[in-house]
Amino acid sequence: MTLKAGIVGIGMIGSDHLRRLANTVSGVEVVAVCDIVAGRAQAALDKYAIEAKDYNDYHDLINDKDVEVVIITASNEAHADVAVAALNANKYVFCEKPLAVTAADCQRVIEAEQKNGKRMVQIGFMRRYDKGYVQLKNIIDSGEIGQPLMVHGRHYNASTVPEYKTPQAIYETLIHEIDVMHWLLNEDYKTVKVYFPRQSSLVTTLRDPQLVVMETTSGINIVVEVFVNCQYGYDIHCDVTGEKGMAELPTVASAAVRKAAKYSTDILVDWKQRFIDAYDIEFQDFFDRLNAGLPPAGPTSWDGYLAAVTADACVKSQETGNTEIVELPSKPDFYK
């Protein structure tokens, strides 16, 4: 069986997912694309030699009777509106992170999904499908290192665009750690606080780096370094300290060179390459389940809502300098 999909938003990640769905993932055919920038979607179709309908308005794509699944890779601000429209048309949704830029918009998606009476949305928190993170979770869940006590994470990018601002370090960067730590530890957050260390002299458009401390409901402390202009590469790190030992996210495999009294390995620069397998696996799982008549099993709309509420608290802490409470309602039975 092959499901027919439409992609809304053919920018950097949308174009990459177009290639992925056309050339790597089985059980899906891309039949329509949409982008507000004239010519962008068609250029991507031409680049990958794909034949599909090219729409300017996402409503037209959603209303296309051939489209069964809507992939949302548009601007973050558009995610909620597109998701709600797709759900109102009773179509399955794969939405890149974040689900929405506000908790209120996430709630709109949750309400639209629940009206259909079944899970129809998966959020693109791809780290849950990364082999290293899966190994880390298996170690934690097995009890091998005992109860987790504290976690240290690092999310570094070599550079970012001038338009990238201070809150985006939370909404677009830390959002991955917010979700993956919640998943690894199977806990919600209680409080958050954002610190601004010494400012990088190479950055003038935002506060960079940032240090985020999150406390879970059981008291686990999580410290994440966010540095989006570190210069040297794309560097993701996570280690979990437990009562009996420590588990660490494996580094990306890279051939080592011994030469001229030096030992060196490469560090990736492109985030798409770091998680290329995770992206492939998450989409294959999504379409395998839908083709088998099963609901999506990946990150839910509720996970997207939890991440948004936590991110809102972090941004508030950026502004106040205080520890902020993460006010999260009880999880609906629909998502249990």
Curated annotation (Swiss-Prot):
One of its GO terms (molecular function) is nucleotide binding. SUPFAM superfamilies: Glyceraldehyde-3-phosphate dehydrogenase-like, C-terminal domain (SSF55347), NAD(P)-binding Rossmann-fold domains (SSF51735). One of its GO terms (biological process) is inositol catabolic process. It catalyses: myo-inositol + NAD(+) = scyllo-inosose + NADH + H(+). Its EC number is 1.1.1.18. The keyword NAD applies. Keywords: NAD, Oxidoreductase. Pfam families: GFO_IDH_MocA, GFO_IDH_MocA_C. It comes from the Bacteria. It is an enzyme of class 1 (oxidoreductase). Involved in the oxidation of myo-inositol (MI) to 2-keto-myo-inositol (2KMI or 2-inosose). Belongs to the Gfo/Idh/MocA family. Homotetramer. This is Inositol 2-dehydrogenase. It comes from Salmonella typhimurium (strain LT2 / SGSC1412 / ATCC 700720). The gene is iolG.
